[in-house]
Amino acid sequence: LHVLTDYLNQDSMKTASGEVRHVILTEEGFTAQSLTRGDVSDIQAAAFAYAYYLVDNNPYIDAFILNRQVDAVIEVEQSCSFGLWTVDMSSPNRVIAVMPKNIYNVFKYIDTNKSLKYTEFAKKIIGINKWSDVIPGFKLQE
């Protein structure tokens, strides 16, 4: 992500008034299902935490908007499970939230003083000891 914002920080990419162009990330998502590994909801939650912290520590990213609150039946049938909640698969024409996934509490607490508590598990999945190992200038107190 920093490669993109570093690129936009070049003089040739700046606005006419010399300002760095900012980025809005939309329709972002991480699946909790894998065709080869099955349920990867811990990886989904860890990926969101990592991505959120990267965005939060980059001054040129203005927004990070997730794809779905609740999984979509048609996407789950294709092993794409992007929501914070599972969906009732028996109601293909309606979106009925069934159960929160691991990502739900990470999402809920990521902007609070409980953030590090709810993302602690992710460091093992990512293979780090502390967030500042992979996020230069990490803002939260570790």
Q: Which ranges hold each PLM region?
A:
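Noncatalytic carbohydrate-binding groove/subsite architecture in carbohydrate-active enzymes
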Residues: L1-G38, T86
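Aromatic-rich peripheral "rim/lid" segments of glycoside hydrolase catalytic domains that contact
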Residues: Q33-E142
